[in-house]
Amino acid sequence: MQRGARVQVIDPHGPAAGASGGIVGALAPHVPENWNPKKQFQLESLLMARSFWAEVEDMGGLSPGYARLGRIQPISDAAGLALAQARATSANSLWGDAARWHVRRSEPTEWTVPSPSGYEIFDTLSARIHPKQACLSLVAALQARGVPILTDGTDQGAIIHAT
């Protein structure tokens, strides 16, 4: 649509019918090592997600339940600690100032998992989203731009089947 395409959405079961009703922490980065084009593409996508979902919410007026909150991972032993520290150096090089992979002393709280080594990783790139809210937020944004959302219809023009 941003490039001028005419769009219609045909979903026989209705938008978000198959979406999970819970929050998902599935927006996490690949480990910052053995870098390749797929990992670079994923990094760029994760970095664009905040502005993308903010724009969707602004257009449609519904929250997608997106937030880039980071992720805490306990480190089990000395070998894991050495690997995490090497990855922190790699992340600094690959991610630049856009995100961080911190190795820090673990601070036990009511909601964290104990770390056997006393250290943990905190990355600032991981995010969470609410799948059903995200679908409904996209629908609201599309409808605000005049896109028909249908349960039945005929294919017209270029067809993209999405799952």
PLM ranges: what are they?
Residues 1-8:
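N-terminal Rossmann-like FAD-binding beta1-loop-alpha1 element of flavoenzymes
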Residues 9-13:
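Conserved acidic E/D residue at the C-terminus of a beta-strand in Rossmann-like folds
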Residues 14-71, 81-91:
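Conserved FAD-binding subdomain of flavin-dependent enzymes
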Residues 57-59, 63-145:
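Flavin (FAD/FMN) cofactor-binding and adjacent substrate-gating region
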Residues 148-159:
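A conserved short coil-to-beta-strand element within the FAD-binding core of flavoproteins
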Residues 162-163:
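Short, well-ordered coil/turn residues at beta-beta hairpins
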